[in-house]
């Protein structure tokens, strides 16, 4: 059986990247929450 996780930088950035997060209200909330928590990495 094929493993489910087949890493791809392109797909990773397109689905979880910073610009994608900034596009929606919910995504911006995620970034804001991570900033408030003091995360070094806000998005992938």
UniProtKB/Swiss-Prot annotation:
Keywords recorded for this protein, A-Z: Ribonucleoprotein, Ribosomal protein
GO molecular function: structural constituent of ribosome
A Pfam family it matches: Ribosomal_L34
Record bears the keyword Repeat: no
Keyword flag GTP-binding: no
InterPro entries: Ribosomal_bL34, Ribosomal_bL34_CS
One GO BP annotation of this record: translation
Superkingdom as given in the UniProt entry: Bacteria
Gene Ontology cellular-component annotations: ribonucleoprotein complex; ribosome
HAMAP family (alphabetical): Ribosomal_bL34 (MF_00391)
NCBIfam families (UniProt xref): rpmH_bact
Family, similarity comment: Belongs to the bacterial ribosomal protein bL34 family.
Name of the protein in question: Large ribosomal subunit protein bL34
Organism: Dechloromonas aromatica (strain RCB)
Gene name per UniProt: rpmH
């Amino acid at each position: 059986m094929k493993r489910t996780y087949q890493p791809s930088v392109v797909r990773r950035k397109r689905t979880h990247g910073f610009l994608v997060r900034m596009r929606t209200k919910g995504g911006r909330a995620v970034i804001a929450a991570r900033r408030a928590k003091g995360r070094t990495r806000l998005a992938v």
